[in-house]
Amino acid sequence: MLRVMTSRNFLTIDDFDIRGKTILLRVDMNSPMDTQGHILDDMRIRSHIATLKDLESAKVVVLAHQSRPGKKDFTTMKPHAHLLSRYLGRQVTYVDDIFGTFAKTQIASMEDGDVIMLENVRFYSEESLERTTAEQANTFMVKKLAPFVDIFLNDAFAVSHRSHLSVVGFTEVLPSGAGRVMEKELISLEKGVKSGERPSVFVLGGAKVDDSLRVTENVLTNGGADRVLLTGVVANVALAASGVNIGKANLDFIKSQGYEDQIERARGLLAKFEDKIGLPKDVALNDNKKRVEAPISELNSDSLPINDIGLETIVDYTNEIQNAKTVVLNGPAGVSEIEDFALGTHEIIKAAIKSDFSIIGGGHISVEVAHLGLEHRFSHISTGGGACIDFLAGEKLPGVEALKAAYNKYQEAKKL
């Protein structure tokens, strides 16, 4: 079955003879939905088309989830199967079951080229429990489904930071590898944090201060970046840590988000990596939704809310970004949903596409990239969210570690 052709530490579709085989494919098609159950953005569904096209000679059983228990959009996979059929150009059969008799009968009766989508895997209570790979392999879902399939492929990078049943459990008992989405995510992000050409610049923003500081610490400690340019709320935290009086309104916002303790953490990073961390020289204040430029030196206790980086900072940052060979962007530079305060984010995006290798970490900045129509100008736009952040922060992702363990297991078997 195996024909290992990769020098990487995980298997891909190319390493398997898939013809006539039954493939269990874990994808991430979790999508925003309206109150009538209509999918509002099908980007994640479309992202898996390349994987499915490369599996046309096999029988494909799709495992996926939608939302989580308690949420209004926690619903069936029927609309996802419908859209997937449209984009794939062939029938994707929705199966109202996960591992019961009906699901197993449907799998057993499949022919080459067939694609079925099982029910929302989170309808099963054990799915979302965080447990070891061995423990997940000992669950009913794995025991019931594994005998009916030949190969497991994880194409759900966005949930691979969770040690969930359908993400890691099957890797213990089946030959396992990465789908095309997972493969591209791992190769691109690895290049972004380790093997990209220099100079390498990370531009971190948004409102998730702890995430940005985790990434900053990792890439500067391990040499993954030459410079980290801070924007957004994390820049405000770092400015406060550096001794700047950013104003009561901005400090109150930081406290309201639970990030007051991150000021001390930022202070430590600035002391350790002072010349490698870029801070704004000026900012844009929100005066009744009007943009007012202000140098850092003029900020005081009565300062208005900071909603963007200033014009001088935009010039400095974009010059540095344009001269970089590798650029990683995560999080907007300001309150980009308000037009006057989207300037910093938009200019940074436009500068990043001029680098040799550019990555968007996902989240709100991806929305702005799409708004500018520049998606195809980036080397990679991550679908990962929290998984992407954890990867950039140097943390091990259970789903990825499970694929590495499966690779090692079948490499050892090959030697026998």
Curated annotation (Swiss-Prot):
Sites where the protein binds substrate: 28-30, 44, 65-68, 122, 162
Keyword Kinase tagged: yes
Entry's Gene Ontology cellular component terms: cytosol
GO biological process, alphabetically ordered: gluconeogenesis; glycolytic process
Subcellular location as annotated: Cytoplasm
Taxonomic source organism: Methanosarcina mazei (strain ATCC BAA-159 / DSM 3647 / Goe1 / Go1 / JCM 11833 / OCM 88) (Methanosarcina frisia)
Reactions the enzyme catalyzes: (2R)-3-phosphoglycerate + ATP = (2R)-3-phospho-glyceroyl phosphate + ADP
Taxonomic placement: Archaea, Methanobacteriati, Methanobacteriota, Stenosarchaea group, Methanomicrobia
Main subcellular location of this protein, as a coarse class: cytoplasm
GO terms assigned for molecular function: ADP binding; ATP binding; phosphoglycerate kinase activity
Record-listed ATP binding positions: 337, 362-365
Disulfide bonds: none
Enzyme nomenclature, EC number: 2.7.2.3
Oligomer status and interactors: Monomer.
Family note: Belongs to the phosphoglycerate kinase family.
Record bears the keyword DNA repair: no
Keywords of this entry: ATP-binding, Cytoplasm, Glycolysis, Kinase, Nucleotide-binding, Transferase
Name used for this protein in its record: Phosphoglycerate kinase
Pathway(s) served: Carbohydrate degradation; glycolysis; pyruvate from D-glyceraldehyde 3-phosphate: step 2/5
